[in-house]
């Protein structure tokens, strides 16, 4: 299994994140993207494994109109700056994913400019789809060409031309060699030639077998793109829609149907880890889409617990709102200040996502387990995931009142690792009493790992002193935590400290 199969992704739209100017006027680069370094402790607290950077290559407008595949957009900074960012992220155990906009380029792309200047004498006429000199473009060029989706500021590349493919693949090799990037997200992957994907997969996997290849696909059979010859994963737009609409419509049958269709018994995408999300740079923020903000934590519990790779769009962990309005995506791609979010954002939601990140890392069945519906009602959903002899149950209640769910289990006792609440099992029967707008992740109560830890972190009297067995820490609430032993996580080998609350006797690891 590769690293990305167990990863939590964090998606940033760099030009918006940094507050860069809307239009690239040239001039000296400004190292705005260094701002991301200040977010590293935040990313680590969320258990993020990789940052997926939206477009960072040189462009004139929004980043999807590339002019140079080997240069960082001067509004974001320099190549040297980005190399430093990659190094620091890697030092902190965070991988780097770049946005590959390889279906089209901007009108200022160097080869297109050559065609504009030299006409039919340009050696690059065959680099662009549908280019011919029998007409004129909407911009007044003395030739016609294909624009992506009718946008003629986005010039479609001819990916059947191997010289074009070579140029793009060599650019990817440059970022792999010089910056040690760990993956590519392919923009508009449904428009890209399949042979190009096969070539770039062979190239990238030959250099780095665990290099992640993910494509933006909105409609269609995901297996056409996500398969052993092409991409590792694609965007799961089917379940993106199902997550929010199931809550807005109070109809869990919808999302349960989609997940079962994809990953249940006989599911059509078993063996493929799809890229799951609840919002991104192209769609309204989840907090603006939901009819009730109390659904937010339920949506994220579902996204982290369902099969696939969970991804969080920057700021949405704090309930940031944003809509596509007046034919503009600016509201979806704001400049955000982390300190402001930590002061005035939805802190309960953020703490919930931090907890989900810990739980996701602690229980392999959440990451790789099968999917089986146990109970589905309009307003309640309970499913189980099994992996290597372990079972996890996930329960959701979107009702504005309490709700009970009864089911059978082979486990002798359960605990909800979100709240820490023990759940009684009587002769194999369980009654789960759920609060309004709540979610639970139930595991066998004999599992002890760092997901069960309280939200607060021990404050050592002498922080420079290494933690040792027998150390005692006084907490703000008056409780005393004692270090009973040191251990290593069985999968990640992460160093863990085993604590015991001296009053309650509860034990956990962090």
Locate each region found by the language model.
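Carbohydrate-interacting/catalytic domains
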Residues: 1-52, 58, 83, 88-89, ...
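Substrate-binding/active-site clefts of carbohydrate-active enzymes
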Residues: 2-8, 13-49, 56-178, 200-206, ...
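Short, well-ordered coil/turn segments that N-cap beta-strands
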Residues: 6, 47-49, 92-94, 180-182, ...
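Hydrophobic faces of well-ordered beta-strands that scaffold small-molecule active sites
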Residues: 8-11, 51-53, 96-98, 184, ...
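Conserved, mostly hydrophobic/aromatic
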Residues: 12, 43, 53, 69, ...
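Active-site-proximal helices and loops of the catalytic beta/alpha 8
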Residues: 116, 177, 187-269, 302, ...
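Active-site clefts of carbohydrate-active enzymes
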Residues: 268-291
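Mixed-charge, low-complexity intrinsically disordered regions
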Residues: 458-510
């Amino acid at each position: 299994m590769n690293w990305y199969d167990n990863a939590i992704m964090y998606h940033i739209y760099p030009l918006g994140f940094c507050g860069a100017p809307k239009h690239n006027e040239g001039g000296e680069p400004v190292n705005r993207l260094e701002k991301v370094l200040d977010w590293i402790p935040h990313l680590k607290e969320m258990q993020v494994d990789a940052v997926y950077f939206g477009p960072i290559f040189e462009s004139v407008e929004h980043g999807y109109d590339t002019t140079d595949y080997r240069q960082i957009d001067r509004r974001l900074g320099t190549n040297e700056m980005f190399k430093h960012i990659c190094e620091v992220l890697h030092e902190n155990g965070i991988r780097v994913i770049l946005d590959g906009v390889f279906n089209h380029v901007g009108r200022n792309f160097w080869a297109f400019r050559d065609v504009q200047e030299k006409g039919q004498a340009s050696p690059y006429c065959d680099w662009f789809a549908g280019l011919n000199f029998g007409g004129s473009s909407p911009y007044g060029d003395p030739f016609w060409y294909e624009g992506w989706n009718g946008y003629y500021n986005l010039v479609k590349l001819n990916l059947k031309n191997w010289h074009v493919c070579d140029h793009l693949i060599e650019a990817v090799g440059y970022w792999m060699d010089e910056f040690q990037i760990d993956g590519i997200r392919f923009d508009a992957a449904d428009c890209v030639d399949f042979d190009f994907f096969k070539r770039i997969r062979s190239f990238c996997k030959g250099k780095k077998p665990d290099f992640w290849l993910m494509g933006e696909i909105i409609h269609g059979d995901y297996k056409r793109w996500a398969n052993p010859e092409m991409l590792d994963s694609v965007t799961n737009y089917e379940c993106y829609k199902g997550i929010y609409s199931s809550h807005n419509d109070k109809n869990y049958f919808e999302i349960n149907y989609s997940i079962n269709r994809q990953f249940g018994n006989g599911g059509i995408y078993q063996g493929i880890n799809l890229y799951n999300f609840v919002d991104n740079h192209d769609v309204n923020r989840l907090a603006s889409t939901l009819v009730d903000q109390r659904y937010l934590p339920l949506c994220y519990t579902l996204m982290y617990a369902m099969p696939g790779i969970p991804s969080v769009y920057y700021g949405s962990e704090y309930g940031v709102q944003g809509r596509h309005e007046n034919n503009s995506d600016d509201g979806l791609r704001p400049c955000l200040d982390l300190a402001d979010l930590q002061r005035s954002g939805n802190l309960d939601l953020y703490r919930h996502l931090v907890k989900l990140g810990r739980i996701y890392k602690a229980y392999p069945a959440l990451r790789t387990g099968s999917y089986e519906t146990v109970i589905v009602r309009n307003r309640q959903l309970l499913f189980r995931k099994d992996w290597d002899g372990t079972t996890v149950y996930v329960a959701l209640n979107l009702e504005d009142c309490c709700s009970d769910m009864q089911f059978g289990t082979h486990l002798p006792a359960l605990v909800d690792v979100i709240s820490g609440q023990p759940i009684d099992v009587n002769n194999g029967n369980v009654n789960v009493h759920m609060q309004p707008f709540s979610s639970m992740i139930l595991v066998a109560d004999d599992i002890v790992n760092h997901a069960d830890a309280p939200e607060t972190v021990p404050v050592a009297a002498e922080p420079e002193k290494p933690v040792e067995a027998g150390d005692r820490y006084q907490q703000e609430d008056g409780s005393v935590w004692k270090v009973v032993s040191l251990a290593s996580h069985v999968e990640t080998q992460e160093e863990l400290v085993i604590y015991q609350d001296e009053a309650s006797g509860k034990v956990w690891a962090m």
